[in-house]
């Protein structure tokens, strides 16, 4: 029944909270991006979310392997990230692959292995497969502040939109009530 539905590719390809798994090695990353290129319509969009590898790398820069950073709220650990890589540099090339971290989320209640995502390198790899970060004006038309950015940028954009149009406050109430720890995660 579904055969041929996206014969020309999908308008939007999405990878939410899983992109980091493809940064284990070059073969895994190249296979993922090739699949994206084959499944995304020419002129289509790719959207993804993950921790910014450079930010996490900098947070863990002075930590030894097995050490990390935790967020405790009311005596309960809600988040932790542990360094599991030995590398001293985080270059914008294929050497940035395989930087393993362990991440704890309260909702999962255990450490899960992930890999740091170097978005500068990822952008170059994506460009090699015909993708490009959309320009700012196109992003704004889609309701985004930029073609690529951090959660903090999106949150600031959201609060600015709600300040301009108070009717949005009801729709986004939960997001607007995030505490500092939730925003950091």
Language model features by range: what are they?
Residues 1-4, 62:
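Class I S-adenosyl-L-methionine-dependent methyltransferase module
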Residues 3-7, 20, 27-43:
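A short glycine-rich, Lys/Arg-flanked "PGG" loop and its adjoining helix->strand segment in the class I
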Residues 11:
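Conserved acidic residues
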Residues 14:
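A conserved beta-strand element that flanks and buttresses the S-adenosyl-L-methionine
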Residues 21-23, 54-58, 142-147:
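Short catalytic/ligand-binding loop motif for oxyanion handling, primarily in non-cytosolic enzymes
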Residues 47-49, 53-129, 134-136:
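SAM-dependent methyltransferase
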Residues 95-185:
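Rossmann-like AdoMet/SAM-dependent catalytic core
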């Amino acid at each position: 029944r579904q055969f041929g539905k996206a014969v020309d590719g999908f308008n939007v390809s999405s990878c939410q909270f899983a992109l980091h798994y493809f940064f284990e090695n070059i073969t895994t990353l190249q296979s993922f991006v090739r699949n994206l290129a084959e499944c995304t319509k020419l002129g289509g969009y790719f959207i993804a979310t993950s921790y910014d590898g450079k930010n996490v790398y900098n947070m863990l820069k002075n930590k030894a392997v097995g050490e990390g950073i935790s967020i405790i709220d009311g005596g309960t650990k809600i988040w932790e990230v542990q360094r599991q890589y030995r590398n001293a540099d985080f270059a914008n090339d294929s050497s940035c692959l395989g930087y393993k971290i362990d991440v704890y989320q309260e909702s999962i209640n255990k450490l899960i292995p992930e890999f740091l995502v170097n978005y500068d390198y990822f952008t170059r790899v994506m460009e090699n497969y015909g993708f490009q970060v959309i320009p700012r004006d196109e992003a704004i038309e889609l309701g985004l502040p930029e073609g690529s950015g951090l959660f903090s940028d999106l949150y600031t954009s959201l609060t600015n939109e709600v300040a301009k149009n108070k009717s949005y406050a009801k729709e986004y109430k939960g997001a607007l009530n995030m505490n500092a720890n939730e925003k950091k995660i």
